[in-house]
Protein backbone atom coordinates (compact mmCIF):
# COMPACT_ATOMS: atom_id res chain seq x y z
CA UNK A 1 0.00 0.00 0.00
CA UNK A 2 2.81 2.36 0.96
CA UNK A 3 4.65 1.70 -2.32
CA UNK A 4 1.50 2.53 -4.34
CA UNK A 5 1.13 5.78 -2.39
CA UNK A 6 4.74 6.74 -3.06
CA UNK A 7 4.34 5.97 -6.78
CA UNK A 8 1.20 8.12 -6.95
CA UNK A 9 2.93 11.05 -5.22
CA UNK A 10 5.91 10.76 -7.59
CA UNK A 11 3.67 10.78 -10.69
CA UNK A 12 1.75 13.75 -9.34
CA UNK A 13 4.96 15.69 -8.70
CA UNK A 14 6.15 15.07 -12.28
CA UNK A 15 2.88 16.42 -13.71
CA UNK A 16 3.15 19.54 -11.58
CA UNK A 17 6.66 20.42 -12.78
CA UNK A 18 6.96 23.69 -14.79
CA UNK A 19 6.30 23.08 -18.47
CA UNK A 20 4.36 19.88 -17.79
CA UNK A 21 0.61 19.50 -18.20
CA UNK A 22 -1.40 16.76 -16.60
CA UNK A 23 -3.69 14.45 -18.52
CA UNK A 24 -6.59 15.74 -16.44
CA UNK A 25 -5.68 19.32 -17.29
CA UNK A 26 -5.67 18.50 -21.01
CA UNK A 27 -9.05 16.82 -20.69
CA UNK A 28 -10.48 19.83 -18.86
CA UNK A 29 -9.24 22.23 -21.53
CA UNK A 30 -10.80 20.11 -24.25
CA UNK A 31 -14.10 19.76 -22.41
CA UNK A 32 -14.26 23.48 -21.59
CA UNK A 33 -14.09 24.49 -25.27
CA UNK A 34 -17.43 26.01 -26.19
CA UNK A 35 -19.73 24.16 -28.57
CA UNK A 36 -20.46 25.74 -31.98
CA UNK A 37 -23.50 28.01 -32.03
CA UNK A 38 -25.66 29.24 -34.89
CA UNK A 39 -25.30 32.98 -35.50
CA UNK A 40 -28.34 32.95 -37.80
CA UNK A 41 -31.51 30.97 -37.07
CA UNK A 42 -32.64 31.00 -40.70
CA UNK A 43 -35.87 32.84 -39.91
CA UNK A 44 -35.27 36.08 -38.03
CA UNK A 45 -32.57 38.78 -37.83
CA UNK A 46 -31.89 37.91 -34.19
CA UNK A 47 -28.22 38.45 -33.42
CA UNK A 48 -27.67 40.87 -36.31
CA UNK A 49 -28.00 44.61 -36.88
CA UNK A 50 -26.82 47.26 -39.29
CA UNK A 51 -23.32 48.68 -39.05
CA UNK A 52 -23.38 51.94 -37.09
CA UNK A 53 -27.10 51.52 -36.41
CA UNK A 54 -29.35 49.70 -33.94
CA UNK A 55 -31.90 47.79 -36.01
CA UNK A 56 -31.94 45.32 -38.88
CA UNK A 57 -31.37 47.23 -42.17
CA UNK A 58 -34.34 45.80 -44.06
CA UNK A 59 -33.78 48.14 -46.98
CA UNK A 60 -30.40 46.54 -47.60
CA UNK A 61 -30.85 42.95 -46.40
CA UNK A 62 -33.62 40.37 -46.46
CA UNK A 63 -34.28 36.87 -45.16
CA UNK A 64 -35.67 34.24 -47.54
CA UNK A 65 -35.55 30.42 -47.62
CA UNK A 66 -33.27 30.28 -44.59
CA UNK A 67 -30.77 32.69 -46.15
CA UNK A 68 -29.47 36.17 -45.39
CA UNK A 69 -29.38 38.05 -48.70
CA UNK A 70 -27.82 41.41 -49.51
CA UNK A 71 -30.12 43.46 -51.74
CA UNK A 72 -28.67 44.48 -55.10
CA UNK A 73 -28.23 48.23 -55.71
CA UNK A 74 -29.65 49.14 -52.30
CA UNK A 75 -28.46 52.67 -51.56
CA UNK A 76 -26.66 52.98 -54.89
CA UNK A 77 -26.90 56.07 -57.03
CA UNK A 78 -26.37 59.79 -56.71
CA UNK A 79 -27.79 61.30 -53.55
CA UNK A 80 -28.62 57.93 -52.01
CA UNK A 81 -27.19 56.36 -48.89
CA UNK A 82 -24.26 53.98 -48.90
CA UNK A 83 -25.05 50.29 -48.64
CA UNK A 84 -25.24 49.03 -45.05
CA UNK A 85 -23.18 46.10 -43.84
CA UNK A 86 -24.70 43.57 -41.47
CA UNK A 87 -22.85 42.99 -38.17
CA UNK A 88 -23.29 40.70 -35.20
CA UNK A 89 -24.81 42.23 -32.09
CA UNK A 90 -22.00 40.68 -30.01
CA UNK A 91 -18.25 41.06 -30.30
CA UNK A 92 -15.91 38.08 -30.54
CA UNK A 93 -12.20 37.58 -29.92
CA UNK A 94 -10.97 34.08 -30.79
CA UNK A 95 -13.12 31.74 -32.85
CA UNK A 96 -13.74 29.54 -35.85
CA UNK A 97 -16.47 30.86 -38.13
CA UNK A 98 -18.03 28.67 -40.81
CA UNK A 99 -20.72 29.55 -43.35
CA UNK A 100 -21.95 28.92 -46.86
CA UNK A 101 -22.25 31.67 -49.47
CA UNK A 102 -23.53 31.93 -53.02
CA UNK A 103 -22.55 34.62 -55.50
CA UNK A 104 -24.68 36.07 -58.27
CA UNK A 105 -23.28 37.56 -61.48
CA UNK A 106 -20.80 40.37 -60.77
CA UNK A 107 -21.26 39.90 -57.01
CA UNK A 108 -18.88 41.57 -54.58
CA UNK A 109 -18.94 41.07 -50.82
CA UNK A 110 -16.80 40.00 -47.91
CA UNK A 111 -16.66 38.76 -44.34
CA UNK A 112 -15.01 41.33 -42.09
CA UNK A 113 -13.66 40.35 -38.70
CA UNK A 114 -12.71 42.21 -35.53
CA UNK A 115 -14.83 45.06 -36.79
CA UNK A 116 -14.92 48.32 -34.86
CA UNK A 117 -17.64 50.86 -35.63
CA UNK A 118 -16.10 54.08 -36.94
CA UNK A 119 -18.30 57.15 -37.05
CA UNK A 120 -19.25 58.07 -40.63
CA UNK A 121 -16.68 55.61 -41.99
CA UNK A 122 -17.17 52.13 -43.48
CA UNK A 123 -16.36 48.89 -41.70
CA UNK A 124 -13.41 48.06 -43.97
CA UNK A 125 -11.43 51.07 -42.73
CA UNK A 126 -10.73 49.15 -39.52
CA UNK A 127 -11.22 45.45 -40.22
CA UNK A 128 -9.53 42.73 -42.30
CA UNK A 129 -11.75 41.17 -44.96
CA UNK A 130 -12.21 37.63 -46.27
CA UNK A 131 -13.00 38.62 -49.85
CA UNK A 132 -16.00 37.11 -51.68
CA UNK A 133 -16.10 37.97 -55.37
CA UNK A 134 -17.25 36.85 -58.80
CA UNK A 135 -13.61 36.38 -59.75
CA UNK A 136 -13.96 35.92 -63.54
CA UNK A 137 -16.06 39.07 -63.91
CA UNK A 138 -13.70 41.27 -61.92
CA UNK A 139 -10.54 39.68 -63.33
CA UNK A 140 -11.73 40.88 -66.73
CA UNK A 141 -12.03 44.38 -65.25
CA UNK A 142 -8.42 44.36 -64.09
CA UNK A 143 -8.61 43.42 -60.42
CA UNK A 144 -5.54 41.68 -59.02
CA UNK A 145 -5.12 38.33 -57.29
CA UNK A 146 -4.83 40.09 -53.92
CA UNK A 147 -8.44 41.26 -54.45
CA UNK A 148 -9.94 37.92 -55.43
CA UNK A 149 -12.07 35.45 -53.45
CA UNK A 150 -10.46 33.99 -50.37
CA UNK A 151 -7.84 36.72 -50.11
CA UNK A 152 -7.29 38.95 -47.10
CA UNK A 153 -8.35 41.87 -49.26
CA UNK A 154 -5.39 43.95 -50.51
CA UNK A 155 -3.08 42.26 -47.99
CA UNK A 156 -2.65 38.54 -48.77
CA UNK A 157 -3.67 36.84 -52.01
CA UNK A 158 -5.38 33.45 -51.88
CA UNK A 159 -2.85 30.70 -52.63
CA UNK A 160 -5.34 28.50 -54.51
CA UNK A 161 -8.21 29.18 -56.90
CA UNK A 162 -11.00 27.01 -55.54
CA UNK A 163 -14.06 29.24 -55.95
CA UNK A 164 -16.99 27.39 -57.52
CA UNK A 165 -18.98 28.63 -60.49
CA UNK A 166 -21.30 31.59 -60.00
CA UNK A 167 -24.61 30.38 -58.59
CA UNK A 168 -23.02 27.49 -56.65
CA UNK A 169 -22.69 27.30 -52.89
CA UNK A 170 -19.19 27.76 -51.44
CA UNK A 171 -17.99 27.01 -47.91
CA UNK A 172 -15.92 29.34 -45.74
CA UNK A 173 -13.93 28.56 -42.61
CA UNK A 174 -12.32 31.53 -40.90
CA UNK A 175 -9.96 30.99 -37.97
CA UNK A 176 -9.13 34.00 -35.78
CA UNK A 177 -7.07 33.07 -32.73
CA UNK A 178 -4.95 35.76 -31.09
CA UNK A 179 -2.91 37.23 -33.93
CA UNK A 180 -3.15 34.05 -36.00
CA UNK A 181 -5.60 34.09 -38.92
CA UNK A 182 -6.52 31.43 -41.48
CA UNK A 183 -8.84 31.70 -44.49
CA UNK A 184 -10.27 28.40 -45.77
CA UNK A 185 -12.35 28.19 -48.94
CA UNK A 186 -14.10 24.97 -49.96
CA UNK A 187 -11.88 22.89 -47.69
CA UNK A 188 -8.59 24.45 -48.81
CA UNK A 189 -6.49 26.78 -46.67
CA UNK A 190 -5.86 29.71 -49.00
CA UNK A 191 -4.46 32.35 -46.61
CA UNK A 192 -2.54 32.19 -43.34
CA UNK A 193 -0.92 35.16 -41.63
CA UNK A 194 -0.05 36.82 -38.32
CA UNK A 195 -1.60 40.17 -37.48
CA UNK A 196 1.01 42.72 -36.45
CA UNK A 197 4.00 40.68 -37.66
CA UNK A 198 6.86 42.38 -39.53
CA UNK A 199 5.58 40.93 -42.79
CA UNK A 200 2.06 42.13 -42.05
CA UNK A 201 3.32 45.64 -41.27
CA UNK A 202 5.17 45.83 -44.59
CA UNK A 203 2.06 44.79 -46.51
CA UNK A 204 -0.08 47.21 -44.52
CA UNK A 205 2.24 50.11 -45.40
CA UNK A 206 1.83 49.34 -49.11
CA UNK A 207 -1.93 48.70 -48.99
CA UNK A 208 -4.97 50.94 -49.40
CA UNK A 209 -5.36 50.76 -45.61
CA UNK A 210 -2.10 52.57 -44.80
CA UNK A 211 -3.95 55.81 -44.05
CA UNK A 212 -6.36 54.08 -41.64
CA UNK A 213 -4.57 53.67 -38.27
CA UNK A 214 -7.37 51.51 -36.80
CA UNK A 215 -6.99 48.80 -39.45
CA UNK A 216 -6.22 45.37 -38.00
CA UNK A 217 -5.41 46.73 -34.55
CA UNK A 218 -8.44 45.38 -32.64
CA UNK A 219 -8.08 42.39 -30.30
CA UNK A 220 -11.83 41.81 -30.43
CA UNK A 221 -14.72 43.03 -32.55
CA UNK A 222 -17.89 42.36 -34.49
CA UNK A 223 -18.25 40.06 -37.50
CA UNK A 224 -19.67 41.78 -40.58
CA UNK A 225 -21.23 40.64 -43.85
CA UNK A 226 -20.59 43.27 -46.48
CA UNK A 227 -23.23 44.75 -48.76
CA UNK A 228 -21.39 46.07 -51.82
CA UNK A 229 -24.50 46.89 -53.87
CA UNK A 230 -24.66 43.31 -55.18
CA UNK A 231 -26.76 40.24 -54.33
CA UNK A 232 -24.99 37.62 -52.22
CA UNK A 233 -26.59 34.77 -50.24
CA UNK A 234 -25.43 33.47 -46.83
CA UNK A 235 -26.61 30.49 -44.77
CA UNK A 236 -25.50 27.94 -42.15
CA UNK A 237 -23.55 30.56 -40.19
CA UNK A 238 -21.87 28.80 -37.26
CA UNK A 239 -19.29 30.04 -34.74
CA UNK A 240 -17.17 28.21 -32.17
CA UNK A 241 -15.34 30.36 -29.65
CA UNK A 242 -11.82 29.26 -28.78
Enumerate the predicted regions with their spans.
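Bacterial Sec-dependent N-terminal signal peptides
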Residues: 1-30
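Carbohydrate-interacting regions of secretory-pathway proteins
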Residues: 21-242
Amino acid sequence: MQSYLLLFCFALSINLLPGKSSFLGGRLQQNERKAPVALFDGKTPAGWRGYDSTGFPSGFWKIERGELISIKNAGAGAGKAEAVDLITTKTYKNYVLELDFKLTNHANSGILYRVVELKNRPSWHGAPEFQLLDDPAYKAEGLKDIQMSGSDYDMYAAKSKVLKRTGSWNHVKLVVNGNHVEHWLNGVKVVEYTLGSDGWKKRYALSKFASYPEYGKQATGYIALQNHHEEVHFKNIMLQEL
